């Protein structure tokens, strides 16, 4: 079944987006694995490392346009994922949809600061921050205190006999001019978001990151998963810079967990609920 597609941010910014997206999908289909794709990109690149004065400026805070995206693929408009699932992963996703129709939606990441992990953190609607250096790029997500390190110093992945799965996996990359190209593996797979599919630990990906203008960073993402996907899953993830008043820079929330003041819900006298008052100000913030 072909999923229904909507008007994504990419489509809003480029009227030729449907044709561009199809070319990107076909690009991923040329390779049997994300690693093969990544190595082909590396061969074609001009530079693989940057000097300090060549590092791009990705400073500031960034957010997903239009608020928190509902789906990993912003072209998707209903609950039919654009991922081409197979086997038990297709069955699990169908069970999720059936449960949702009955009013039961599973969301283990909505409380207690449990990391969404990779690739789910890419779609997170809370602020993002990027710390770019010649040898590493850090992608930080405010929600759930997520930190993803992408090594660009020429190292390979953790050797297989030392490696184990983690929430964000093991990411390496290189620079092609001002474009960051990454490969990720050794993730825990798992759940990608509310009413979205599960993926396996066989997941690996290629991402192509670049700043397209002063206000926009985009990432073209191809996810390969030999156990969960029939074909690579391509999406474009877009991040817009959050406006900041001069002299009053914004920052990520210091800490995110069950006990963060803005996450504690308490019962009111009338039986309703509200968030607990912040204790570092005398102002009434109800």
Mark where each language-model region is.
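PEST-like low-complexity, intrinsically disordered acidic/proline/serine-rich tracts
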Residues: 5-286
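Sec-dependent, cleavable N-terminal signal peptides
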Residues: 1-3
